[in-house]
């Protein structure tokens, strides 16, 4: 028998018909997983009648990277409205910042309170 002509080659390639060379090649399609933005949380500072205003400004500068003017503005909001937003963060970061603020307030014997709220 002579060489096979292109018309006589089976669709899956040359072979003797016993399936040795009939390899099905396919593409595995994985469902796309959609990444979501994490939920964000506001860190809120609550007013009290005992924590010095300068301490509140210091906390805002130290833990929330606020300038003196920004910190003073937030401190006045807390003082006048009873609550102020220190920043918006992912849950873990917000929780960590609340802990840092509360620890420093306790070390300095201030009753300052911070909490988180879903944004």
UniProtKB/Swiss-Prot annotation:
Write down the Gene3D superfamilies for this protein, in alphabetical order.
3.30.1390.10
Transmembrane segment boundaries: none
The GO biological-process annotations, alphabetized, read as: protein catabolic process; proteolysis
Q: Tell me the domain of life.
A: Bacteria
- Note the SUPFAM superfamilies from the entry: ClpS-like
**Segments for region (Disordered):** 1-24
* PANTHER family in the cross-refs: ATP-DEPENDENT CLP PROTEASE ADAPTER PROTEIN CLPS (PTHR33473:SF19), ATP-DEPENDENT CLP PROTEASE ADAPTER PROTEIN CLPS1, CHLOROPLASTIC (PTHR33473)
Family matches, as HAMAP family: ClpS
Instruction: Give the multimer and partner information.
Output: Binds to the N-terminal domain of the chaperone ClpA.
Alphabetized NCBIfam families for the sequence: PRK00033.1-2, PRK00033.1-5
- Family, per entry: Belongs to the ClpS family.
**Function noted in UniProt:** Involved in the modulation of the specificity of the ClpAP-mediated ATP-dependent protein degradation.
Q: What is this protein called?
A: ATP-dependent Clp protease adapter protein ClpS
Which organism was this protein described from? Gluconobacter oxydans (strain 621H)
């Amino acid at each position: 028998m002579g060489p096979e002509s292109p018309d006589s080659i089976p669709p899956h390639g040359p072979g003797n018909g016993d399936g040795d060379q009939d390899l099905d090649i396919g593409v595995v399609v994985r469902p796309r997983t959609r990444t979501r933005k994490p939920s964000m949380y506001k860190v809120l500072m609550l007013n009290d009648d005992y924590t010095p205003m300068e301490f509140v400004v210091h906390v805002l500068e130290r833990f929330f990277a606020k300038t003196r003017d920004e910190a003073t503005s937030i401190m006045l909001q807390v003082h006048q409205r009873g609550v102020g937003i220190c920043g918006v963060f992912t849950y873990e970061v917000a929780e960590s910042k609340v802990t840092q603020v509360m620890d420093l307030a306790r070390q300095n014997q201030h009753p300052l309170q911070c909490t988180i709220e879903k944004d």
